[in-house]
Amino acid sequence: MPVYNLEFQIYINVPAKAAYDHLNDPHHFVGLQPLLTHVDTVKYGEQDGCKTVSYETVEAFRWQGIVLYRNRIRVQTVFTRPPEQFNTVVHSFPNITLHVEYTFTPKDNGVLIKETTQVHAYAWLAKFVTNEATRVQNILLANLKNRLET
């Protein structure tokens, strides 16, 4: 299955730990990520000495305001280097997997957040998936900036 790489970054005028702490609660993604409608089945654990959180969520794909498809996705986040980095794996239908790494670098009085995403998707779906991921992640980061700076 082909792999597609995406990268996003944003500067937010808050301490790195504040941004990191906000994103390590999966419920905070509702309202940040425009497709998510809710988060459920949240489970906390540990993997290789790192704290983890696993959960399920639903993405609602709309066309002209009408929900056409609800996509249940499974997510696992490993907090690899708090408060500097965490990694998330997203599993979605049909056999789409996203490996996402967030890094939080203090800069001036705020934080530079960098998101690196590897999208594993069938070639026939790749353009839709990468375009949608790009659109959604840009909105997520802009919403995060707005939420944390106001």
Where are these regions (language model features)?
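Beta-strand elements of well-folded, non-transmembrane domains
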Residues: 12-16, 57-63, 79-81, 92-96, ...
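Glycine-rich portal/gate segments that line the openings of hydrophobic small-molecule binding cavities
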Residues: 41-91, 143-150
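Hydrophobic ligand-binding cavity/cleft-lining segments
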Residues: 1-51
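Short beta-strand micro-motifs in enzyme catalytic cores
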Residues: 4, 51-53, 100, 111
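Hydrophobic pocket/interface hotspot
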Residues: 18-23, 29, 77, 113-115, ...
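Short, solvent-exposed secondary-structure boundary motifs
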Residues: 1-2, 29-35, 63-70, 90-95
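Beta-strand/loop substructures that line and gate deep hydrophobic ligand-binding cavities in soluble
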Residues: 87-138
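Short, surface-exposed coil-to-beta transition loops
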Residues: 5-7, 68-75, 96-101
